[in-house]
Amino acid sequence: METNYEKRGYLLDDFRLFHLKDKNGTNIDYHYHEFCKLLLLRSGYGGYTVDGQRYDLKTGDAVLIGSQCVHRPEFEPGVLYERIIIYISPQFLQQQSTPDCQLEEIFNGKKGAVLHLENPEAIWTLADSLEQELEGNAYGRVILSNGLLLRLLIALARRMQNPVAAFAKPIVPTNSRILDILHYIDAHLTEDIPIERLAEEFFISKYHMMRLFRQETGYSIHGYLQERRLLHARELIRQG
């Protein structure tokens, strides 16, 4: 099955950290990586779509994106968008895991992809310490950097395990017709679904449907179809 999703970035190290701050907004297509991604939002607000689920983001949120997960950030120009992004090799996570601490599970999305952090300063402090260590060339830099990253990940995992952990809920369209269209698409993913067919099926103008769909979901119909088909194909591969 062909898709237009782009694999972005290559990770030659165990992990890399980026501390970015700008007001440029984002203009990034849906894409995926072969590594895990942690984003700590230190300033700003916007949206983030991960594996077909769209979330509202606010300052203090952590976004946890597993390897191969299709995602896209959505931030408007003019809003200060400060974030720390850490790319992490799945092999590194596996090597550092123990039977009772499987670090890759942090990114499996079972509870959700976005965690609202209460008192995020403690997590930010750990990230700042890691950033400072990576920028230097002091004795034991690699060992200490590895330890700081592991400490950060375990601190996040412990918060995720808290029974009152606040995971963001995906945004669900409220328009009943759009909900019906979403259900129809999911039930016919393996078929050709032209826009005209959807419009006829639901007795709605093609152009009105396209506008309403984007308004309610944040996707174009074509973009949603592509993402759902990619996720479906990935699930079939997992199942063998």
Residue ranges and their predicted role:
Residues M1-K21, S67-G136, L153-V164:
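A hydrophobic/aromatic-rich effector-binding and dimerization subdomain
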Residues H31-Y48, L64:
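Short, conserved beta-strand element in jelly-roll/cupin
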Residues R42, W124-A138, L182, D186-L189, ...:
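Regular secondary-structure segments
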Residues G52-G66:
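Short acidic-glycine-tyrosine-enriched beta hairpin
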Residues L134-R151, K169-V172:
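All-alpha amphipathic helical-bundle segments outside canonical DNA-binding/catalytic cores
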Residues D180, Y184-H232, R238-Q239:
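Basic/polar phosphate-binding segments, predominantly the helix-turn-helix DNA-binding elements
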